[in-house]
């Protein structure tokens, strides 16, 4: 068995608040809102040298080499989404909760594993 590759990294986990409830009542409009939010979040994560390594529905998990970069990315995309929500007239206003955690992680290919991912 090969040696496990580890490194210290900051994990950012973002999740849309009440996404399932929005989908129950306004499925298509909620999906459009989610796409709008991802069009905001993804480039901001990239701007701060983050790497999205997992998405599922309304959740995003990204790896950063710095807690400061992860925090700044979260603050920036939250502010832009807040502005988007203030202007949105027809589609649901989606809010995002974010967890950030610095820990030793296991890297296997493009995937990241470990307790640090779970905590974030």
Label each residue range with its predicted role.
Residues 1-73, 79-80:
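Catalytic NTP-binding/metal-coordinating core of nucleotidyl cyclase/transferase enzymes
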Residues 39-42, 61-120:
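Catalytic beta-strand-to-alpha-helix segment of the class III nucleotidyl cyclase homology domain
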